Amino acid sequence: MAKISAAQVKELRDKTGVGMMDAKKALVAVEGDMEKAIDFLREKGMAKAAKKSDRVAAEGLANVAVNGNKAVIVEVNAETDFVAQNDQFKALVKHIADVIAENTPADVEAALQLKTDKGTLNDELIEATQVIGEKISLRRFEVVEKADADNFGAYLHDGGRIAVLSVVEGADEATAKDVAMHVAAINPKYVNRDEVPEAEVAHEKEVLTEEAKNEGKPEKIIEKMVAGRLNKFFAEVALDDQDFVKDPDLTVAKYVASKNGKVKSFVRYEVGEGIEKKEENFAEEVMSQIK
């Protein structure tokens, strides 16, 4: 039998909201496999679908810059929130976004070599690191292109802790910005249900079927139940199926259609997503300073 650690139990509880003993039993039942443990709990009707929320640890800001039919969304990291709220840092992030939007490099490495008034973007990051006293780094960016009939929508939440760049066909810029704001708030994974990978849909259907069986539902109504619950799943992950935050009586797709448009794409950056911050032991930190 696989040995289950307290950290595994905590992670499963954080992801599913179940109690400690239920989390441990699930992990024991599946030999410590986290994803299988989540499915196990869901099939027993004990947990909702776990949201894959990466711990946000790094500091910094994201921003959006538009240059004609091209736009860019960028994330620049610092070490502390104090620096991230510094006006000099905010100006640097905007400058980096503008330079990348104008030149549309292929990747971060190419972006760092872009020429600026002070040499290259990399030179500017080095200078900022020296002046501000913290490591400043360009983490990622994505260049997005649109057709003449499309509009970009840009939205920054909390000054750039979350940034969204959307592309809407047919509707105006205000509608595109509304879509970007919704994406910032709700965090969908896909534009519409057609974008959801078949394997993900099949897996969800399998889990929902087992859940219905474990509830003792008759076979003849299980299929109808699963179809209904699958629609709820699509509403969680697909933008078009979600209730629009500014008018819950409409889905996002219907809201945009009322403005004679449709959503083509979106990119959402949340600062630090996917980065694990090193956790310092406070006692050890104090001892290291007095040695």
From Swiss-Prot:
Principal subcellular localisation of the protein: cytoplasm
InterPro entries in the cross-refs: EF-Ts_dimer_sf (IPR036402), Transl_elong_EFTs/EF1B (IPR001816), Transl_elong_EFTs/EF1B_dimer (IPR014039), Transl_elong_Ts_CS (IPR018101), UBA-like_sf (IPR009060)
Gene Ontology cellular component annotations, sorted alphabetically: cytoplasm
Subcellular location: Cytoplasm
Disulfide linkage: none
Cited Pfam families: EF_TS
Keyword Thylakoid: no
Region listing for Involved in Mg(2+) ion dislocation from EF-Tu, in residue ranges: 80-83
Molecular-function GO term, any one: translation elongation factor activity
Keyword line: Cytoplasm, Elongation factor, Protein biosynthesis
Gene3D superfamilies: 1.10.286.20, DNA helicase RuvA subunit, C-terminal domain (1.10.8.10), Elongation factor Ts, dimerisation domain (3.30.479.20)
Function text: Associates with the EF-Tu.GDP complex and induces the exchange of GDP to GTP. It remains bound to the aminoacyl-tRNA.EF-Tu.GTP complex up to the GTP hydrolysis stage on the ribosome.
Family membership: Belongs to the EF-Ts family.
Protein name: Elongation factor Ts
Originating organism: Ligilactobacillus salivarius (strain UCC118)
